[in-house]
Amino acid sequence: KGQSCLYYSFGYFESIFLRLKGVPYAYEISDIAYGFPSFGKARPLLRAIDRNLVKNAQFTLLTSEGFKGFLNQPKARFIVQPNKVNRKIIGVERKPLNLKDDHFIFSFVGSIRYASMMRFARTIGKYFPQHEFHFHGVANVESTQKAIDDMMELYPNIKLFGDFKNPDDFEHIYNSVDVVVVTYGVESLNETILDPNKLYEGIFFCRPLIATKGTFLAEQIESYGCGISIDSSTEEAIRDSLRLLTIEQLNNISRKEYEIEREEVFDSMDNLSTLLEEICKKRKN
């Protein structure tokens, strides 16, 4: 009947199945399955179900502290395990910025699919010819790729470098840019409360980050002192914020990132392993 097993669920609907089956389960949440705008009216009901799932799980692993605040279930047993940097590159040398002139290379590293990132790049192209914007990654749909191609045709300071190998290419990528752009929008719930690995990559490579105000990521950046948050809803708002950026400000942020211990930003399974061992001992007894 499954009572002698601990099932590990990686999803919302899988956890519903295990809950109905009445077997012990652990629940991992890496995004909110009903966090997209199309779920708007049904979200209160789906959230109520989710709160019941985490309450009855042996434990719930969250990849963002922001999920914990959203679920607001004090009776649940949570463990927060953000997607941090792969330990494969833990020995890589960290190089703080030493900018000397008003030429900044802004970059987005990852799957290119966010309208807010495209807006940021377009703003650099249109208003800041002295700067550059680099895309490192692949567009997820043809229309996004066409939009990038159109921008590159209009603005020579926008560049696309394509796919990369994670984490092997990170040292080359991050050492070739100055600022990491993580201006995820606020249109989707998931974008508002996620804690992306780009935060920890930026910190490790001592590159200041720019996030969108009103997001959990912006709170994290403020807590670490590793960047700034802006209104990214329009090109004009982005332009006005970027005009205030200075060489000294970026260099100071980079030096502060360098002071953060590297262990702080790398993946560790210690907490999860300890918890699983504890649960297994209890079940044997």
Residue ranges with predicted function:
Residues 232-239, 247-281:
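A charged, aromatic-enriched C-terminal amphipathic alpha-helix characteristic of glycosyltransferases
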